[in-house]
């Protein structure tokens, strides 16, 4: 029987709504994909029959968030303000409520099969728009889904949408420190901490929670996995409770990372042995205190026995011993332990060819399968090393049949450009999730394992390291939030395509204009492959500075140390033998069908060849190229593709706001220059090591390049750059004179318009200044203040400045003046004079 509703026509006046609308007008990226831009009249016309009133059945913070959000969305996209319903009557309405509440009034409703957080949206016979779910969080997700459909201009006239999440765990991690820094964060300081204090009243916490909820994220861990034990101090619990309150209205559970040594370091015990009853009691008391303040506290994340973090091995105990003692304290409160499988020895003997970091996660956790309590989740990185641009799927994902597991992805671009390079990671994650591990000799794609159905596990799922910061657009690069959006959409539905996700995000974040949506989504979809091409192809890993900033080329930093990210390049060939027959045996950790494909170089995909096999430079790939020629070709192709991004972006000028356009263009131009740094470093290194020339004559030959050290120098001094491949010719020049230095040469080419490209170094501890003169006329100047991570001259500090459209005549003197600042010595590497093509 259908009951009737009456609705008061109340006007909503909510400060959050006003703030959000102002942020949309500013177009800084603060609103992410929740801009709710106004639809054109033709598109908006299809929503004329949308009810003008909204009612929530219930009285909870989450439902109020849903109602407020829908009003905001309709106001933004359609220019209407929904009335808030209060009583029974005849007029149709948008009705928000859980299924039990909805069915009190709509007893003839035939509800679909919904799981926790799943939702249903449909029009009933009286044109009420029913927005319902099994729980209140699901109603919120349904509301965001409805708002998204309208913002995308999709029809809802015959909507009957049922959506269940693929997995119950859809969490994000922040690696924020109490001092306000963020480990592997590239977008400002922490929104949660500063100077040892918790920023519980920071309004960005609420804004972040709203963004997460809009794409179905249901948990957030707010502090670094390299955890400071003092976060557990009693004085911090009230502030953590305030953050949990902000999260709660958006359906997000708060969790924190804990240090296993806490019972000893802050608890007054002389031990943290997980099998000591006093340690178990300490954890129980601490957990009880947390739940007294935060009844819906989510649980703990644990990193132990890894990279200097103490763990159970200190007492001869296992990860299961450590996880279970905490899990048992959490169990009465329904809390969870996320125990990271990132456990390895970073003091491996590199001289032993059988040592292999890739084997560590499987070796440490597979023997313990079935020994973890049922509220423990093993958090497993997608690959066996460390978030590289390309690595195989972790075999551990298919090996834990009696243990809950979650895949760990990384939104923050630690090894994939640190939000200075465009790198849309969804295509990579799709490959991982679609990969068939053939567990139990049956078809078992990773995405099916993560549902929990493959091995009948109850709390499997997804975790991503995000590391948003105080930058207005959350992740620094205006295009980087596409990775957070894409992660969350895949965690909900891993069968979505990368193309669908890219187009959705672009339309919501920038514009539904087909030119904008097509252009930006096209750039996104090609960017991961582009980044891989100019960094580390063929499974070599990223070839970056692994012992320092994790940014820029530094090939030998991977070798001859204990970190285990070896590529084993020598004068004969490159790659690490991980076969069972002759290598480390890593390939044997996979199920037989997968292991067989990786055991032989002939059946290993080219993209992973050097990860599994040491091969000669003359080895012929499936593509028909030799390994060495592929190295040359891929790096030149990648740099060329990166250069096209800036040109493509310029076709969008005027199609959306100037601020995001200009910031993105500057980053894409920087990426184009840094891709050349990568190209030259890798090609020159392997040219020298292999002694095999580039068949196309590019590597080692740079037409139009003038080395800085060959110019006429005034107070500039020549320096050797280490590693040598990070500067053209292995040398650069720097200025130590406070009032500046200069370098000049005479141009001997044909007169005309040229682009002057200067490869310079930008150090973070100072802002060096540069000026370019042609025939004593100032043609360009800039300050090196791009906030690169570098503290010395090298691959992570090298950038390229372009001065286009400069008229140069034969005999003109070209002079570069540099003025140092602090530790930035206005250094540069070379100049290239490139003819400006007429169009």
Where are these regions (language model features)?
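Bacterial N-terminal signal peptides
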Residues: 8-18
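Acidic, contiguous N-terminal accessory segments
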Residues: 22-126, 157
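Acidic/histidine-rich, surface-exposed loop or edge segments in extracytoplasmic proteins
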Residues: 45-61, 189-193, 223-226, 621-628
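Feature activates predominantly on carbohydrate-active enzymes
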Residues: 59-69, 73, 103, 108-301, ...
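An acidic- and aromatic-residue-enriched active-site/binding cleft used to recognize and process polar
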Residues: 99, 134-136, 177, 217, ...
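Catalytic domains of carbohydrate-active enzymes that cleave complex glycans
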Residues: 443-702
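Extracytoplasmic
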Residues: 693-839
């Amino acid at each position: 029987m259908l009951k009737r509703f009456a609705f008061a026509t109340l006007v909503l006046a909510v400060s959050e709504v006003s703030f959000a609308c102002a942020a949309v007008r500013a177009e800084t990226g603060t609103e992410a994909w929740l801009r709710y831009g106004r639809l054109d009249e033709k598109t908006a016309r299809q929503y004329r029959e949308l009810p003008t009133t909204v009612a929530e059945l219930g009285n909870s913070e989450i439902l109020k968030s849903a109602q407020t959000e829908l009003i905001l969305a309709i106001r933004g996209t359609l220019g209407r303000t929904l009335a808030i319903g209060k009583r029974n009557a005849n007029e149709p309405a948008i009705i928000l409520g859980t299924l039990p509440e909805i069915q009190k009034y709509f007893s003839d409703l035939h509800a679909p099969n919904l799981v926790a957080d799943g939702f249903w949206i449909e029009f009933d016979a009286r044109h009420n728009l029913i927005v319902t779910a099994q729980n209140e969080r699901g109603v919120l997700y349904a509301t965001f889904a409805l708002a998204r459909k309208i913002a995308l201009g999709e029809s809802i006239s015959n909507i009957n949408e049922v959506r269940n999440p693929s997995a119950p765990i859809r969490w994000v991690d922040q690696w924020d420190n109490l001092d306000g820094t963020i480990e592997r964060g590239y977008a400002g300081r922490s929104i949660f901490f500063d100077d040892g204090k918790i920023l519980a009243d920071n309004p960005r916490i609420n804004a972040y929670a709203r963004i997460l909820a809009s794409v179905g994220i249901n948990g957030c861990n707010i502090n670094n996995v390299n955890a400071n034990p003092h976060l557990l101090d009693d004085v911090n619990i009230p502030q953590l409770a305030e953050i949990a309150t902000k999260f709660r209205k958006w359906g997000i559970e708060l969790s924190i990372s804990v240090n296993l040594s806490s019972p000893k370091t802050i608890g007054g015990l002389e031990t943290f042995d997980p099998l000591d009853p006093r340690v178990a009691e300490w954890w129980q008391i601490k957990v009880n205190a947390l739940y007294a303040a935060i009844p819906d506290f989510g649980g703990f994340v644990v990193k132990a026995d890894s990279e200097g973090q103490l763990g159970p091995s200190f007492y001869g105990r296992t990860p299961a011993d450590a996880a279970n003692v905490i899990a048992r304290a959490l169990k009465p409160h329904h809390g969870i332990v996320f125990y990271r499988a990132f456990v390895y020895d970073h003091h491996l003997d590199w001289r032993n060819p059988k040592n292999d970091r890739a084997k560590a996660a499987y070796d440490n956790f597979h023997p313990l399968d079935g020994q973890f309590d049922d509220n423990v989740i093993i958090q497993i990185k997608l690959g066996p090393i460390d978030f590289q641009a390309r690595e195989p799927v972790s075999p551990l994902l298919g090996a834990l049949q009696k243990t809950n597991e979650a895949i760990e992805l990384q939104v923050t671009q630690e090894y994939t450009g640190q939000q200075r390079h465009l790198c849309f990671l969804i295509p990579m994650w799709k490959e991982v999730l679609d990969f068939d591990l053939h567990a139990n000799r049956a078809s078992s794609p990773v995405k099916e394992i993560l549902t929990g159905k493959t091995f009948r596990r109850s709390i499997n799922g997804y975790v991503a390291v995000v590391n948003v910061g105080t930058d207005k657009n959350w992740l620094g690069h205006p295009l980087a939030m596409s990775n957070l959006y894409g992660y969350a959409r895949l965690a909900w539905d891993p069968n979505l395509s990368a193309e669908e996700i890219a187009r959705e995000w672009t339309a919501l974040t920038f514009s539904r204009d087909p030119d904008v949506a097509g252009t930006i989504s096209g750039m996104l979809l090609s960017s991961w492959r582009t980044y891989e091409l100019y960094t580390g192809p063929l499974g070599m890993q990223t070839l970056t500075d692994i012992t320092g900033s994790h940014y820029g080329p530094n090939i030998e930093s991977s070798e001859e140390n204990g970190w285990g990210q070896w590529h084993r390049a020598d004068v004969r060939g490159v790659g690490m033998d991980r076969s069972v027959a002759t290598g480390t045996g890593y390939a044997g950790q996979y199920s037989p069908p997968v292991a067989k494909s990786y055991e032989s170089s002939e059946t290993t995909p080219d993209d992973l060849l050097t990860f599994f096999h040491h091969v000669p430079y003359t080895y012929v790939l499936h593509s028909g190229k030799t390994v060495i020629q592929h190295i040359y070709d891929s790096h030149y192709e990648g740099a060329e593709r990166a250069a096209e991004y800036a040109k493509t972006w310029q076709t969008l000028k005027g199609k959306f706001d100037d601020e995001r356009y200009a910031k993105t263009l500057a980053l894409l131009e920087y990426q184009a220059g840094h891709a050349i740094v990568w190209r030259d470093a890798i090609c020159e290194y392997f040219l020298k090591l292999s002694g095999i020339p580039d068949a196309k004559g590019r590597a080692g030959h740079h037409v139009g390049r003038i080395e800085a050290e060959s110019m006429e120098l005034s107070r500039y001094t020549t320096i050797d750059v280490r590693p040598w491949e990070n500067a053209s010719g292995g040398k650069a020049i720097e200025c130590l004179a406070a009032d500046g230095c200069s370098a000049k040469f005479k141009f001997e080419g044909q007169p005309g318009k040229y682009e002057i490209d200067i490869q310079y170094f930008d150090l973070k501890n100072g802002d060096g200044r540069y000026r370019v003169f042609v025939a004593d006329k100032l043609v360009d100047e800039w300050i090196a203040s791009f906030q690169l991570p570098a503290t010395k001259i090298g691959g992570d500090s090298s950038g390229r400045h372009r001065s286009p459209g400069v008229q140069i005549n034969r005999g003109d003197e070209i002079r570069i003046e540099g003025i140092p600042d602090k530790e930035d010595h206005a250094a540069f590497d070379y100049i290239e004079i490139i003819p400006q093509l007429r169009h």
